Amino acid sequence: MKPVIETHALCKSYHGRPVVDHLNLTVPEGCVYGFLGPNGAGKSTTMKMLLGLVHPTGGSVELLGHTLNEANRIALLRQTGSLIESPSGYLHLTARENLSIVADLKDVDRKDISRVLEIVHLTKDADRKVGQYSLGMKQRLGIAMALLGNPKLLILDEPTNGLDPAGIQEMRSLIASMPQTTGATVLISSHLLGEIE
């Protein structure tokens, strides 16, 4: 299988302190790939570099067979869904309204909203205000936003953080099914070994 993500000696320093130091990472197509490390190890920084949100101090990133740069960043991100740190959404709007905004921003047909709601098991709660959602439901909504447009790659930064045991199990099952249900490769970070296994 060809890799969907490759990093070559990827580095990031803040004020001379290395946060990511010569990371060589290869994520094969069609899998769920775990990225494990303790808190403060640079996982979120790495994921932000993969998305072009943080510029590396050194090294390079290849996404979907192309070296990530300013010229192709937007085109590559149209094929990439992400949930970095915590889910965002307008609490005073419904899930469907939030997804409509994201679909418009991504220039994705609103018909895709029903598909992603079904994948994340939020169809029956689609017309509830997001402010009434549990954290697990907000996380699933964040994943639904990432799935709009049927991306080839999903980058999920600690998506089970703060969830109760039932929410963690539900999220694990959802993520494990992604390559089969959506065709997307998934990169997931965690500081818990049991989570990645």
How does the language model describe each region?
Residues 59-69, 75-76:
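Conserved ABC transporter NBD signature motif
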